[in-house]
């Protein structure tokens, strides 16, 4: 009995030790757009598949990798860009003016049935256009890659929305747009905290 008591006490002390606490440390994601994202494609993909388990897992995995890579190249927060894609496409359910085959993941140019939005030749280029458009809203520095966003020049003044909250009434007419992005980032943070020890990948 005494041995069992001390064993239990030892295990409890281990679970409360710093190395175990690190496993449960919450990742606080920045709401600033011009900075490096924290999350890996695996984490973004895992979150996405929980929100829409019927999505094409291979496509989600590819998108997550494109977002992390393209955002890193332009100094943009990939966590925000990926979450914005989730909001704009309804986690790739679409259903609005933009259709899946357009490779338009942020509603670029979507105004009406007559102007349903821009079409891009591949997922990679569609993601790049999204990142470039975010860069125009959040930063004043030059692009690192060739311009593929036809609407880039229409963002004036450059750098007017350094955080997600500045996208309300600018990127989107919805005055609650920034709050919706914030709510999605909070969901992502909660997901990471709950699933911090999970290494499951849905794809391979």
Question: Which ranges hold each PLM region?
Answer:
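Bacterial N-terminal signal peptides
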Residues: 4-13
């Amino acid at each position: 009995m005494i041995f069992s008591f001390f064993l239990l006490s030892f295990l409890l002390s281990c679970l409360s030790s710093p190395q175990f606490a690190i496993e449960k440390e919450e990742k606080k994601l920045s709401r600033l757009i011009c900075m490096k994202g924290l999350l890996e494609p695996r984490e973004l993909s895992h979150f996405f598949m929980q929100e829409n388990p019927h999505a094409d897992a291979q496509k989600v995995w590819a998108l997550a990798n494109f977002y992390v890579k393209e955002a890193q190249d332009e100094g943009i927060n990939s966590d925000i860009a990926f979450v914005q894609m989730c909001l704009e496409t309804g986690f790739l359910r679409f259903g609005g003016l933009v259709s899946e085959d357009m490779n338009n993941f942020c509603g670029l140019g979507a105004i009406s049935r007559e102007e349903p939005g821009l079409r891009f030749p591949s997922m990679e280029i569609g993601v790049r256009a999204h990142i470039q458009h975010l860069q125009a809203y959040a930063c004043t520095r030059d692009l690192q890659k060739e311009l593929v966003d036809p609407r880039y020049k229409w963002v004036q003044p450059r750098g007017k929305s350094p955080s997600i909250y500045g996208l309300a009434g600018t990127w989107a007419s919805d005055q609650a747009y920034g709050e919706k992005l914030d709510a999605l980032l909070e969901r992502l943070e909660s997901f990471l905290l709950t699933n911090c020890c999970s290494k499951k990948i849905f794809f391979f």
